Amino acid sequence: MSMQDPIADMFTRIRNAQGANKVTVKMPSSKQKVAIAQVLKEEGFITGYSAESTVKPELEVELKYFEGKPVIETIERVSRPGLRIYKKRNELPNVMGGLGIAVVSTSKGLMTDRAARQAGLGGEIIGYVA
């Protein structure tokens, strides 16, 4: 059976792994998932990640905890296959008053809402992380 929304699956795997206090979580890999993991690492939400290109490419995400609690409080999918959400540069959301990030897919690649605003770009809102 094919997966309908791989990004939502990635977010769910991260959410479930943190709920079970796992150190790492593995999932099928894709270029977009690796780009999302890179954004999460740059923003300090995960410790790191590694992408293995074997017969079945796998992405392993190293989760981050602070004083025993997960750093990622909420991670949710916004734009989905059945309802794409696009925003112009001046309409990009401020997640939790600037404490969280919105992952935005722009013409220059995946970036945070802050980086997209600075670059003057809008795009598809992939999800919110806080």
Swiss-Prot record:
GO terms (molecular function) for this protein are: rRNA binding; structural constituent of ribosome
Supply the Pfam families for this chain. Answer: Ribosomal_S8 (PF00410)
Family, as annotated: Belongs to the universal ribosomal protein uS8 family.
Q: Which SUPFAM superfamilies match?
A: Ribosomal protein S8
Q: Which organism is it from?
A: Idiomarina loihiensis (strain ATCC BAA-735 / DSM 15497 / L2-TR)
HAMAP family the UniProt entry points to: Ribosomal_uS8_B
Q: Which PROSITE patterns match?
A: RIBOSOMAL_S8 (PS00053)
Protein name, as recorded? Small ribosomal subunit protein uS8
What keywords are assigned to this protein?
Ribonucleoprotein, Ribosomal protein, RNA-binding, rRNA-binding
Cited NCBIfam families = PRK00136.1
GO CC entries: ribonucleoprotein complex; ribosome
| Keyword RNA-binding in annotation | yes
- Gene Ontology process terms (BP): translation
What is this protein for, i.e. what is its function? One of the primary rRNA binding proteins, it binds directly to 16S rRNA central domain where it helps coordinate assembly of the platform of the 30S subunit.
Q: How does it assemble?
A: Part of the 30S ribosomal subunit. Contacts proteins S5 and S12.
The question of whether RNA-binding is a record keyword is answered with: yes
